[in-house]
Design a protein with these regions (language model features):
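Partner-binding and oligomerization surfaces adjacent to conserved cores of proteins
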Residues: 1-324
Length: 324
């Protein structure tokens, strides 16, 4: 198991499934990921529950409730790392090397527009030309001043913080937590009401979680993109997931959308929404031996919670010694 978990961590570290990749290429990488994980899912995974009407309803109705990370009691769960200093230094290196001035020079001469058209299409190139021609000279001069970029990096820092927070609150990704060890005193104490709850045993080895197949909203959902809901082992490391590149691309797309009314010019790693939720501290959490079910569904964005059919994967129930 430890060998597999090391291979899984290495796979996530080196693999990027870009949002603009050809379907054949992205499908190949998804299949590689599933072929690595599915044969290594333990026969028994356990979910500890307190005695509440919600837990009882899930059990009765054959559901697994997933939720956004912000609903977890641990406020540092799914907290990613972004290298703000690197971003700031990169921006000012570009500025100090005359990059901004050169950009404006090519705008004025028209040299930049064929490049934009080649990369992003004629429509965006025409919008860029129109914006440049309508920008007053005093505004252009202000953009060329170093104080503008100091203010820009300060505002960028605020945007980065907002995106880091959004990882925990974004309703596209919802989580359910499981463990390999039903006898863990730590898990009974913290997640089963201090031994007064219960634990459910699941066998997910043959669970065909292809998302849309089991989604109750599939007939009314306009987006039939595959939802790769499955279970993955948590990676215990004192190094958090470095989301610098993904978040900068997301922010850049956000800025470009506000300027050009276009979407997703820069590709984003689709595994970003997996990696963000699969890293936890080695020293504080390794004893949990946790696996996570990650649900990504575009038709379930109206709530912090989503119910996933358990497909009769429950094999046993264990009562805590203090259950009433």
């Amino acid at each position: 198991m430890e060998k597999f978990k090391k291979e899984f961590a290495e796979y996530l570290a080196r693999t990027f499934i870009l949002s603009n990749a050809p379907k054949e290429e992205s499908d190949k990488l998804w299949i590689e990921l599933n072929n690595l994980v599915l044969p290594n899912i333990p026969q028994k995974l356990f979910r500890f529950r307190g005695c509440s009407k919600y837990s009882f309803a899930d059990f009765k109705n054959g559901k697994i409730t997933t939720c956004v990370a912000d609903r977890f009691p641990d406020e540092y769960d799914s907290m990613v790392y972004v290298n703000k200093e690197y971003i700031k230094n990169t921006i000012f290196s570009f500025y100090n090397a005359g990059g901004v001035q050169a950009l404006y020079d090519t705008k004025g001469s028209g040299e930049i527009y064929p490049i934009i058209e080649q990369q992003f299409g004629k429509g965006l190139a025409d919008k860029a030309r129109l914006i440049n021609e309508s920008t007053p000279t005093e505004i252009q001069q202000r953009i060329l001043d170093t104080s503008y970029w100091e203010q820009f990096t300060d505002e960028l820092s605020i945007l980065i913080d907002a995106h880091i927070k959004n990882i925990r609150t974004n309703r596209f990704t919802k989580i359910a937590c499981f463990t390999e060890d039903v006898q863990s005193q730590y898990m009974w104490d913290n997640y089963a009401g201090g031994y007064s709850g219960f634990a459910l045993e699941y066998d997910f080895r043959n669970l065909a979680f292809n998302g849309c197949e089991v989604c109750p909203k599939v007939k009314e959902c306009e987006e039939h993109s595959k939802n790769f809901t499955s279970v993955y082992p948590v990676i215990y490391s004192e190094t958090r997931y470095d989301a610098t590149d993904s978040i900068i691309n997301l922010i850049t797309n956000q800025i470009l959308k506000s300027i050009f009314s276009t979407t997703n010019l820069l590709p984003v790693d689709l595994l970003h929404w997996y990696k963000s939720h699969l890293y936890k501290g080695q020293n504080g959490y390794a004893q949990e031996k946790e696996w996570r079910m990650l649900s990504h569904c575009p038709s379930a964005m109206d709530s912090d919670f989503t119910e996933i059919p358990d497909r009769q994967c429950i094999k046993a129930i264990y009562y805590g010694p203090k259950i009433k």
